[in-house]
Design a protein with these regions (language model features):
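Secretory targeting and sorting signals
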Residues: 2-41
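Low-complexity, acidic Ser/Thr/Pro-rich repeat tracts that form intrinsically disordered stalk/linker regions
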Residues: 41-48
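The feature captures the LRR N-terminal capping module
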Residues: 52-55
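Structural detector of coil-to-beta-strand junctions
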Residues: 60-62, 83-84, 110, 135-137, ...
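Surface-exposed intrinsically disordered loops and tails
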Residues: 223-233
Length: 255
């Protein structure tokens, strides 16, 4: 893990070429009429419930609170440090999107989720997410009951799926991972200096995975990570929780 330095965020407006319409689909609110976004230099109207200004870190789309229950579908996110940030929200589905060419010193992940639940990340493509700090494909922080299924991950410097700070009951199922990861395909880490806790009951099954980002084999899972240094009292160490926080449910095969 690495430390991030804050910098002044760039303020943007999402310009919509036509009005939005809302349609019910399977009990969820799906926003239609969305074209590819065009960003300007000032804040503007939100396209999704709970959408608002982004914190420092160069995100493209930020949701903080709101009713949830909607879908982000069929978009392409590229050319920034990060793509989507979800905070304090439930029951959001992210499906059929492409996350590519994300890079920068404040890059955390393609999809960064905090303090949320019931997030579904399904049938997306994550490719060329790379920086010196090992950014991830999906990064769940204090997040529960979420599903990562049927996605493809390739050329990602950090672990393609990383969970943190008490994340529990999350599943990683039926994904394909190639040339991605520094420590594992699915890893858990916490900042014990901030009082963050171990997760629990996270699972992985029926995935296909190849070597890590540098072309060498990686373990499928690593859990109970803490620390970030190479030596000394802050040395990165695994299996520091009392019980495993991620369980291999089987059916995972190497490519």
């Amino acid at each position: 893990m690495r430390k991030h330095t804050e910098r002044t965020p760039r303020h943007r407006t999402l310009l919509l070429p036509r009005p939005l319409a809302a349609a019910a689909l399977g009990g969820a609110l799906v926003l239609t009429g969305l074209a590819e976004p065009s960003w300007s230099a000032t804040a503007g109207a939100a396209a999704y419930p709970g959408q608002g200004p982004c914190p420092p870190g160069d995100y493209q789309l930020c949701i903080n609170g709101g009713p949830g229950g909607f879908t982000i579908r069929g978009r392409t996110f590229s050319g920034h440090d990060n793509a989507i940030l979800l905070r304090n929200v439930s029951d959001v589905t992210i499906t059929g999107n492409t996350f590519k060419n994300l890079s920068g010193r404040t890059g955390y992940a393609g999809v960064h989720v905090k303090n949320s639940s019931g997030i579904v990340i399904r049938k997306n493509k994550f490719t060329k997410l790379r920086n010196a700090g090992h950014m991830h494909g999906v990064y769940l922080v204090n997040t529960t009951g979420s599903t990562i299924a049927g996605n493809t991950f390739s050329s990602i410097t950090g672990d393609p799926v990383r969970i943190r700070d008490g994340s529990r009951n999350n599943s990683v199922t039926g994904n394909t991972f190639t040339r991605s990861g520094t420590y594992a395909i699915f890893s858990e880490w916490r900042d014990h200096r901030k009082g963050e806790s171990c997760g629990s009951a996270n699972t992985i099954k029926n995935n296909k995975y190849g070597p890590g980002y540098r072309g060498t084999p990686l373990p499928l899972i690593r859990w109970g990570g803490r620390g970030s240094g190479k030596t000394g009292p802050d040395k990165l160490t695994w299996k520091t929780c009392k019980t495993p926080t991620i369980t291999n449910r089987g059916g995972n095969t190497r490519l």
